[in-house]
Amino acid sequence: MEVNVERLKELRRERVLSLRELEGKSGVSYNTIWRLEDGRQGAHPRTLRKLAEALGVAPSELIRGGGDTDG
């Protein structure tokens, strides 16, 4: 799945989490998170679910074109 890179970074920064801290909260490896944020790879649905849960959002918010931001 194509990750909304900017949204992932924004959510992590809003929660004042480093990549290592997000790794600890989500169980997703540092390298995977780094590659996702850098746009170097897509994500499996399970990975998106883990990241979304750690960030307190719906998985759809992390998918390009998946988050409803129109109010």
Can you say where each PLM-predicted feature lies in the sequence?
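Short alpha-helical DNA-recognition segment
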Residues: 16-35
